[in-house]
């Protein structure tokens, strides 16, 4: 669809690669948030941008994806690496955001990702979260058909 720009943000949570997930991100532009880069290989993707403080990416990922442009941020920041990735996607014209690897794993991270999806939906941004075998769609009162 003309004018649509779907971005998939690779987050560091759990991921199960499924045919449905592959269809959902087909043709999407990809941004990795810190250790979310670990999912790039399993998905057969090379992100156009890698953001974060790189406190959890690990030296092997840093070497394997050395050619991917990076935006390094201080660990002492007021946003999560996922939020920074979403901000970049919006800056680059995202009309839809898929948060990949945003469920499962550490409960505080999953909760933060759910809150981020709600924030995006409240601002009119189309988004959802998937880890391949679980999905979450923010529903805002008065906006669901």
For every predicted segment, state its role:
Residues 1-64:
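N-terminal beta-strand-loop-alpha-helix module at the start
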Residues 17-19, 79-83, 106-111:
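Short glycine/serine/threonine-rich phosphate/pyrophosphate-binding segments
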Residues 33, 53, 73, 99, ...:
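Generic beta-sheet signal
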Residues 41, 90-93:
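Non-catalytic positions within long, well-ordered alpha-helices that form the structural scaffold/packing
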Residues 70-91:
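Short phosphate-binding loop-to-helix
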Residues 96-141:
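Anionic-ligand-binding alpha/beta catalytic cores of soluble enzymes and soluble regulatory domains
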């Amino acid at each position: 669809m003309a004018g649509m720009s779907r971005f998939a943000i690779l987050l560091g949570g759990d991921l199960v690669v499924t045919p449905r997930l592959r269809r959902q991100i087909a043709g999407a532009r990809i941004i990795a948030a810190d250790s979310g880069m670990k999912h790039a290989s399993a998905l057969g993707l090379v992100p156009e941008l890698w953001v974060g403080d790189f406190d959890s990416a690990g030296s092997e990922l840093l070497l394997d994806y050395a050619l991917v442009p990076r935006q390094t941020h201080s660990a002492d920041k007021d946003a999560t690496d996922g939020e920074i990735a979403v901000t970049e996607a919006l800056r680059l014209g995202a009309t839809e955001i898929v948060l990949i690897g945003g469920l499962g794993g550490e409960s505080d991270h999953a909760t933060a990702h759910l809150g981020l999806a709600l924030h995006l939906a409240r601002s009119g941004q189309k988004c959802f979260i998937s880890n391949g075998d679980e999905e979450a769609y923010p529903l805002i009162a008065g906006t669901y058909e």
